[in-house]
Amino acid sequence: MTAALWLGLSGVLSAAAQAAPLSHDVTIGYVQIADDSRYDDKEGPAETTIAPPRPLPGAEMAVDEVNIDAATVGRLDKLDHEEAGSADALTAQVDAMAAKGEHWFLIDAPDEAMETLAKAERDKDVILFNISARDDALRGGACQPELLDVIPSRAMLADALAQFLVARKWPNVLVLRGPLPDDKKDAAAFASAATRFGLRIADTRDFIVSNDPRHRDQDNIALLTGGASYDVVYVADADGTFARSLPYATIRPRPVIGATGLVPTAWSWTWERYGAPQVSHRFKKRVGRDMTATDWAAWLAVRALDDALRESHATSTEAADKYLLGPQMNIDGAKGPPLSFRAWDHQLRQPILLTTPDATIADAPMPGFLHQTNVLDTLGYDRPETKCKF
């Protein structure tokens, strides 16, 4: 990063006010939404229901871990967990906590709520760590200087799959797209990745899950996967009901990727390198379940903040933020290369794991994909492509 660019960035971060003094002990805000539909019970196999877990335990584990080292310098990190009653109440909740002196916040909120919050907090003395919203717009036209995206974007996940297909020489893809808004966003991200990496979309077909005979053509896997030539099937299905039955049911014997089969993710218990098994084991021993991608994002956000505080010896929040977003930041995320935030959109650059339920098959960037400065920037929107303007 050039000196001029960094001076411009630091000016944006400090536009709201003079640097706030840094308390010896640090309280990290954590805010989630009570009625977040992403955590509603979802239909599972054999008439079961599945309740997706919230990522709070990841942050709690990280706070306990960093306090072991922080205690040696007399610092204690605390987590202030609050719940907004609704998406509309999210900004008021963050503002109330900021009024108590809290500066750093982990935010677990869906795309639209995150965008509204980040816009409302622009030029305020806060930093928001996005640990669960994947919308590309948050890293693009709706970006804000106070928003740091820890969870990977849809574009990063799609690019990882596209690189894998190129590496395996499976260039022809049949896309099956569900009816939900997230399905359409995921399919659009994959289509963009396909164009970027030279894949060919053989066809895009919409499915719905229904017992209505009028929708037979959109609910029958054999019909949906017949009549086209392709190497692999990509399925966009946010709730997973359709995707669950897709592998081994396609009319042609082809692998399935996307929402099932080979799935791109920030974290998996099957990842066995760079200290990852120890992280996964500590989490499972503590919480009683496997660590998810959002658990990892919450854990990583706390670890990143601790690294910035410890390495910078900052005496103000502004100085800590400058280090956190600076070129010298190297975060150990148990995924191999050091992680850091991109200057142009504040997305955390990171490898993407390509996993099945039982194994990590590959981690992207795939070998052979090169970049002039950082190979991790082959995933997601690079500086020349970004629509983000702080």
Report the location of each language-model feature.
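Bacterial N-terminal signal peptides
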Residues: 2-14
